[in-house]
Each structure stands twice: as C-alpha cells, then as structure tokens.
Regions:
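Sec-dependent N-terminal signal peptides
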Residues: 26-35
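Aromatic (phenylalanine/tyrosine) cluster motif
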Residues: 2-8, 20-21, 27
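Bacterial Sec-dependent signal peptides at the C-terminal "C-region" and cleavage site
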Residues: 34-45
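Leucine-biased recognition of intrinsically disordered, low-complexity hydrophobic segments
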Residues: 15-16
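Catalytic glycan-binding domains that act on GlcNAc-containing polysaccharides
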Residues: 43-257
Length: 257
C-alpha cells in the first residue's frame, strides 16, 4: 500500500516538475520575443558589435600586408574582398569564447560534411564551403589555373583529404586563397549578371558567401535583404542583414573602427 502510494506521489511530483519547466520555457520564449521586438527597433549593428568592431579593426591592421599581397596576386580589390568577410570577422569575435570544435573535427574526418559541418577560423569557413570550391575548380580547371593548388589529390583517402582540408582552414593563408577562389567562382558562375554599381555587386557576393554559392539564384537574392545574422534564421533575438553590414564597411571602412 505504502509502496503504491509512494510511487503515485513520485509520479505526480515528476509530472508537476515537467509542467513547471515547460511553463518556464514558454515564458522564456515569450519574454525573448517581446525583448527581440524592442531590440530590433533600438539596436544598430554598430552598437550591437561595438566591442567586436574594435577587435576586428586590430585584426585587419595586423594582417593588412598579408591580405593586400593576396589581393594583388589574384587581381581583386582589397576593400571589396574584406567587405565580404567583415560580418564573419564580427561573428568570430562575438562567439569565439564558446567555440569548441575538436569533437566536430573528428566527426567530420570520419563521416564527412553531411554529418558535421561547422565554421572555422576568422572567416568562418565550413568544410562544405571548401569542398564546393574545390569541386567547382576541378570541374572548370581551364578557367581556374591560378587556383589549382586547392584541388586535393584523389590518391588520398577521404579521411586524409578531410584532415588536410581542416588543417588548411585553420591557416589564414589558405583561407585567403579559398576566399579569392570564391570571388573568382562568383565572377565565373554569375557572369550573366550586370551590376549597376560595385556596391550592388558586393551585396550579391556577400549574400552568396553567407548562404553558399551553390544555392539557387533566387535564394541568394532573397538573402540580400534578410535579417538572419549572426545567429541564423531560427533565432528570435536581434538580427541583422549580412549583406548590409558588408556594404556599410565597404562604403566607409574607417567608421567601422
């Protein structure tokens, strides 16, 4: 009798506990939505990333020579190149204290990008991004002679290829090469587009970098205007438009310091 009674009380206690935490979660979500509406109305990305902007300015100054050399090598405008990844530099400094990728790296090496795909380094490049660039260059080898070193030899096993790719993405020099290859790919893939201004071109290339150049043209156009940065489309808090931040930097880089 007492055993049954005790079990009943225990079950009720657990049920009430679950209800309490469920209500707590619902309340938190409602509070977040309410706060988000206010935040979106009062925050600019300049104030939201105030501390990150200072760190990014120092990073760009420290690596100015390296970035200019790469831009000169591949005949790209340095400010245009930097603007594309400027939002990612902000994001990197925003989340770096929470980054732990060792487990994901092992999972990626063993199973591939479909199982584990995550952002790496200051430019926040994912393994799948590098893979797509390598595949595009290999498919159009005649037009991408200057980027042929990005192609990983097929003799290497898939695990070794992934390990090498991860090692590359942890180095700034390689990330810069992938970045310039990305711009060259956009020039090649979207050659039919006629941009009125360089800013319009940047807006498209930045949106494309944000969601992936392999996505459909209409999806990229849509992303030019969406406030899904820095936490993705499912996040309910303060968000900004990736392409707009890139353009703001390009128009007046000194104001971002």
């Amino acid at each position: 009798m007492f055993s049954i009674y005790y079990s009943y009380i225990n079950c009720v206690s657990i049920l009430l506990s679950e209800i309490f935490f469920a209500m707590k979660r619902i309340f938190s979500i409602l509070l977040l939505i309410s706060f988000s509406a206010t935040s979106l109305a009062t925050y600019s990305f300049e104030s939201y990333f105030k501390e990150e902007r200072v760190l990014v300015a120092k990073y760009l100054q420290a690596n100015k020579s390296k970035m200019e050399q790469k831009a000169s090598k591949y005949h790209h405008d340095q400010e245009f190149v930097t603007a594309i990844i400027y939002p990612e530099l902000l994001r990197y400094n925003y989340i770096q204290d929470f980054i732990e990728t060792s487990g994901l790296e092992i999972l990626y090496m063993r199973c591939g990008a479909k199982t584990a795909d995550f952002s790496i380094g200051h430019f926040q490049m994912k393994p799948s991004f590098a893979e797509n660039i390598e595949k595009y260059i290999e498919k159009n080898a005649e037009d991408f002679y200057h980027y042929k070193k990005l192609i990983i030899k097929h003799k290497a096993t898939p695990v070794v290829q992934r390990k090498l790719r991860l090692a590359r993405l942890k180095q700034m020099d390689w990330q810069l090469t992938y970045l310039h290859a990305y711009i060259a790919i956009c020039d090649h893939k979207f050659h039919f587009l006629k941009f009125t201004t360089t800013k319009d071109k940047l807006r498209f290339y930045a949106a494309c970098y944000n969601i992936g150049f392999h996505k459909k043209y209409q999806n990229i156009l849509q992303n030019e205007k969406l406030n899904t940065f820095p936490n993705g489309p499912k996040y309910l808090g303060t968000q900004f438009c990736y392409a707009s931040i890139a353009c703001a930097y390009y128009v007046n880089p000194k104001s971002m310091q």
